[in-house]
Amino acid sequence: MAWLADYWWIILIILIGMLINGIKELRNVDHTRFLLNKPKLPPHRDNNDKWDDEDDDWPKKKP
């Protein structure tokens, strides 16, 4: 761990460089083109649909 005490500034420079490169790459993302060409999501599967109406303990809404 003595090397960490001696070279902490190199690790800090590397982390700052990674952060700056990440920000630059995120700025290059064209979100409008992605939203226009977004793939369709499959329909939602409701895994509780067979229990939805059976033995409903909640009171019914009165009109």
Swiss-Prot record:
Listed under GO cellular component are: plasma membrane
Membrane topology, record value: Single-pass membrane protein
Q: Which Pfam families match?
A: UPF0370 (PF13980)
Record InterPro entries: UPF0370
Q: Report whether Cytoplasm shows up as a keyword of the record.
A: no
Source taxon at top rank: Bacteria
Annotated compartments: Cell membrane
UniProt name for this protein: UPF0370 protein PC1_1167
Q: Which organism is it from?
A: Pectobacterium carotovorum subsp. carotovorum (strain PC1)
